[in-house]
């Protein structure tokens, strides 16, 4: 299975002056933990990291944590563009791909394996977790307008798995129609293509804020 790790973000929401994936959590950069988990997944036999040129040397120094060769891919100005560049860089024999946020450093190797297995057996799939909070929809003034049925709500995570040809087609359609999406599953949704969820549990968090770093450090300290 081919894996693309999206690592071209910034530390803006973290309040940091550099890519958040290079910030330390429990003694290692965030990306190091993500690479270690990916490398420990038996299903993963090719890894590409999509990042910005200014982070290349710092990230390349972490590739050994994967325990297998890692391909560097220069990202674009948005996540959407970066993933499209990642798809272009895949080996010619790639038929399926998992896309994973580098900031989800608590991901367990078995989550990669389960997503890979589900993808090969039944088509597009994403890691997710059922929403436990009551969600409110509000208007521009902050007034509640609706309370969606919680039993139908899942929080999307990564990895997200797709057919390479279908995901490339999805990105081509997005470019042609000027669609802007925050994850790849949204492309399939807009095109009416089915995507299933795989329960990865609530621990597969995305490290985005200083609080997330604290939580991640506590979890890693207990492993």
Curated annotation (Swiss-Prot):
Site residues, Transition state stabilizer: 13, 20
Pathway: Isoprenoid biosynthesis; isopentenyl diphosphate biosynthesis via DXP pathway; isopentenyl diphosphate from 1-deoxy-D-xylulose 5-phosphate: step 2/6
Origin superkingdom: Bacteria
Assigned EC number: 2.7.7.60
CDD domains with a match to the protein in the record: CDP-ME_synthetase
Keyword Cytoplasm attributed: no
Keyword Nucleotidyltransferase on entry: yes
InterPro entries tied to this protein: IspD, IspD/TarI, IspD/TarI_cytidylyltransf_bact, ISPD_synthase_CS, Nucleotide-diphossugar_trans
Main EC class the enzyme belongs to: transferase
UniProt site (Positions MEP for the nucleophilic attack): 150, 206
Reaction catalysed by this enzyme: 2-C-methyl-D-erythritol 4-phosphate + CTP + H(+) = 4-CDP-2-C-methyl-D-erythritol + diphosphate
Assigned keywords, A-Z: Isoprene biosynthesis, Nucleotidyltransferase, Transferase
GO biological process: isopentenyl diphosphate biosynthetic process, methylerythritol 4-phosphate pathway
Annotated disulfide bonds: none
Family in the record: Belongs to the IspD/TarI cytidylyltransferase family. IspD subfamily.
Purpose of the protein: Catalyzes the formation of 4-diphosphocytidyl-2-C-methyl-D-erythritol from CTP and 2-C-methyl-D-erythritol 4-phosphate (MEP).
Family annotation (PANTHER family): 2-C-METHYL-D-ERYTHRITOL 4-PHOSPHATE CYTIDYLYLTRANSFERASE, CHLOROPLASTIC
Name used for this protein in its record: 2-C-methyl-D-erythritol 4-phosphate cytidylyltransferase
Organism of derivation: Synechococcus sp. (strain WH7803)
